[in-house]
Swiss-Prot record:
Subcellular location field: Cytoplasm
Top-level taxon of origin: Bacteria
Single GO MF descriptor: DNA replication origin binding
Gene: dnaA
One GO CC term on file: cytoplasm
Region of interest called Domain III, AAA+ region, as start-end residue ranges on this chain: 124-340
Protein family membership: Belongs to the DnaA family.
Protein name per its UniProtKB record: Chromosomal replication initiator protein DnaA
């Protein structure tokens, strides 16, 4: 297959001038030339999804550009890389081609929202979550393409768009990028980003105050609604009932619905079948954990955005160490930079590696250090920390202190109990188990634990 052709190259240059940058980079640039015979131009898209999207949305535009260049009518047909590979045993498998495709950051002409539009857009969107900052890899290519398609043409084919994937993989980023894109294109667009928890709280508040009419107006009179963490609808029967009717009202009016979840619709439990059916009626796109190449690109992009310089071997070390999600990866980057800045140590693998150990404090610390650091961090006195107080702020700080002491010292459970005012070893065991559970589901707890670990690391390093 000839991938470079003078005519297709000219057509691409023409389209580059007329299409938006994100449209060109996402749909036109990846298309490869296959053949041009008898006025028939055959192009190869990376996958079936891209092929179908090009056919439905860009065929006439490409044919018009080709006609202007060739001087006669040109018909364009699209095939996917996968279909081409079936016709030739010498072709590589599509999955291999996608995995080996160089990961790149997606450019967007509407990345940084203008200050004028920011002030008119009180919709809860995080200004950092734009397409420009999203690094596209094999793990997220489909979800990214679907998000862009919805941003460009809301309320059409992919309605709803259901984005699913594990914690910290970029679901919220893509959702909010759609919102930013629409607001930049149309400053008057009514865009609403909301977590399922907030939606639930609003419904409860509406019931208590007899104000459901206002709640319905709030959520049903929008052009684009972005619903995050829909899995938290599980078991909430009345909220599900309200969301069902809200979904129907939005869909019937042509408003775009984008939903995010930690699992696909068919794996959600405790949610009405009629809702599951509606979640599945549009497009479902999942995001997988990023591969090594993508993780490296993410760190390089973050370093560029933060105007920081990290040695390549340190970037590769972090990328190889933190593999499960992007949030954890970027957190490691931030901690490495902060650690080197505070301690004055060089940015090398040797100096940073111990601090980035996700399973331990990294150096042995004393029980007193743990108690003092937890006390300072949570603004709880040491006397309260080792007392029997059951106030939530105190008990939570105490549990985290017990967890850190278990992983940062060589003390047994009974000895840890002694350090916390003579608590029973079963109390210590329960506290550790509770923290371990929360670490996987509560980003706030995970962040608090990690920050205290880093502070303990810094203190210990200063004393070496």
């Amino acid at each position: 297959m000839q991938t470079i052709n003078p005519i297709w190259a000219e057509v691409q240059q023409s389209l580059k001038k007329t299409l938006s940058k994100p449209s060109f980079e996402t749909w036109i640039r990846p298309a490869k030339f296959n053949c041009f015979e008898n006025g028939l131009l055959t192009l190869i898209a990376p996958n079936t999804f891209s092929s179908d999207w090009l056919r439905k949305n860009y065929c006439q535009t490409i044919e018009k550009a080709a006609k202007e260049i060739c001087g006669h009518d040109v018909k364009v047909v699209f095939k996917s890389e996968k279909n081409i590979s079936r016709d030739s045993t010498n072709k590589e498998n599509l999955d291999d081609q996608i995995v080996n495709h160089k990961t790149k950051s997606f450019p967007n002409n509407s990345q940084e929202i203008s200050s004028k539009n920011r002030s008119k857009n009180p919709n809860g969107l995080n200004l950092r979550y734009v397409f420009k900052r999203f690094v596209v890899g094999p793990n997220s290519r489909l979800a990214h393409a679907a998000a862009l398609a919805v941003a460009e043409s809301p309320g059409r084919e992919f309605n709803p768009l259901f984005i699913c994937g594990g914690v910290g993989l970029g679901k919220t980023h893509l959702m909010q990028a759609i919102g930013h894109y629409r607001v930049e294109i149309d400053p008057e667009a009514k865009v609403k980003y909301v977590s399922t928890e907030t939606f639930t709280n609003d419904v409860i508040s509406g019931i208590r105050r007899d104000g459901m009419t206002a709640i319905r107006d709030k959520y049903r009179n929008v052009d684009l609604i972005l619903i995050d963490d829909i899995q938290f609808l599980e078991g909430k029967e009345y909220t599900q009932e309200e969301f069902f009717h809200t979904f129907n009202a939005l869909h019937e009016s042509g408003s775009q619905i984008v939903i995010a979840s930690d699992r696909p619709p068919n794996q959600l439990s405790g949610i009405q079948e009629r809702l599951i059916s509606r979640f599945s009626m549009g497009m479902t796109a999942d995001i997988q954990p990023p591969d090594l190449e993508t993780r490296t690109a993410i760190l390089q992009k973050k370093a560029e955005q933060e105007s920081m310089s990290l040695p390549r071997d340190l970037i590769q070390f972090i990328a190889g160490r933190f593999t499960s999600n992007i949030r954890e990866l970027e957190g490691a980057f931030t901690r490495a930079v902060a650690f080197a800045s505070i301690t004055g140590l060089p940015m090398t693998v040797q100096s940073i590696a111990p601090m980035l150990d996700p399973n331990s404090v990294g150096v042995v610390v004393s029980p007193k250090q743990v108690i003092n650091k937890v006390s300072d961090f949570f603004k709880v006195s040491t006397d309260e920390l080792i007392s029997s107080s059951r106030r939530k702020p105190v008990s939570q700080a105490r549990q985290i202190g017990m967890y850190l002491m278990r992983h940062g010292t060589d003390l047994s459970l009974p000895r840890i109990g002694d350090e916390f005012g003579g608590k029973d070893h079963t109390t210590v065991m329960y506290a550790i188990e509770q923290v371990e559970k929360k670490l996987s589901i509560d980003p706030n707890i995970a962040s608090q634990v990690q920050k205290i670990r880093d502070l303990l690391q810094i203190d210990s390093r200063k004393n070496l």
